[in-house]
Amino acid sequence: MSFTVLIPARLASTRLPDKPLADIAGKPMVVRVAERAALSGAERVMIATDDARVQQAAADHGHAAILTRPDHPTGTDRLSEAVDALGLPDDAIVVNVQGDEPLIEPALIDAVAAQLVAAPHADIATCACPLADAEALFDPNVVKVVCAADRRALYFSRAPIPWARDALAGGARVLAPGLPAWHHIGIYAYRVAFLRRFPALSQGQLERYESLEQLRAMEHGHVIVVHHTDSAPAAGVDTPADLERARAAYTNRL
């Protein structure tokens, strides 16, 4: 199985300024992400950034980075530019590992790539784990996904789906036993042909209402398959508290 890992890393961040360069045990966070990705089965790991400082930080630690335009509306648009710059063929597979995931498990990267390889009818693969509890089911910040028997995604939502009519009658807030409720994990594998088409896809109503970019692909008829894993991976770094948690994890490993 051959695939490339691309790590989009945008320097601007409202909650954590200069996030890709934040120090984690002596190295920039984006470098820590690249190190984790390099432990996967990827043939190549490449950072795609909008800032020369990130590119230089990567180079200082022996990692490759490509400089992309600063005006991309999404990380997926940034990947589209990167695959063209790298000259990747349409049938190649790219795994998008976010630049704020310094604790990502290399095995998860491999599993998502393998899920796409096993589904030639699909353009995208992603990941999900069982919902932890009723609080997660009703939390709009926890994205849910429902799947067909063949692991094809049927819908992603911030709403509590699927709705267990009987268990939730009368306003109850419970996680019904056996409910096939899955917590979406935001790691993606793409076929390069899809990434090249993505910038031309118009944003649909479902994406606008849910504020979930993956719905754009589904609204345009693209198939997403979902790798199921038993438990949620470590969360990404979005806040100063998240950064301290990641630093502590690395300190404990060293």
From Swiss-Prot:
Its EC number is 2.7.7.38. This is 3-deoxy-manno-octulosonate cytidylyltransferase. Pfam families: CTP_transf_3. It is an enzyme of class 2 (transferase). Signal peptide: none annotated. One of its GO terms (cellular component) is cytosol. Keywords: Cytoplasm, Lipopolysaccharide biosynthesis, Nucleotidyltransferase, Transferase. GO terms for biological process: CMP-keto-3-deoxy-D-manno-octulosonic acid biosynthetic process; lipopolysaccharide biosynthetic process. The keyword Cytoplasm applies. It comes from Bordetella bronchiseptica (strain ATCC BAA-588 / NCTC 13252 / RB50). It is found in: Cytoplasm. CDD domains: CMP-KDO-Synthetase. It catalyses: 3-deoxy-alpha-D-manno-oct-2-ulosonate + CTP = CMP-3-deoxy-beta-D-manno-octulosonate + diphosphate. Belongs to the KdsB family. GO terms for molecular function: 3-deoxy-manno-octulosonate cytidylyltransferase activity. Activates KDO (a required 8-carbon sugar) for incorporation into bacterial lipopolysaccharide in Gram-negative bacteria. Pathway: Nucleotide-sugar biosynthesis; CMP-3-deoxy-D-manno-octulosonate biosynthesis; CMP-3-deoxy-D-manno-octulosonate from 3-deoxy-D-manno-octulosonate and CTP: step 1/1; Bacterial outer membrane biogenesis; lipopolysaccharide biosynthesis.
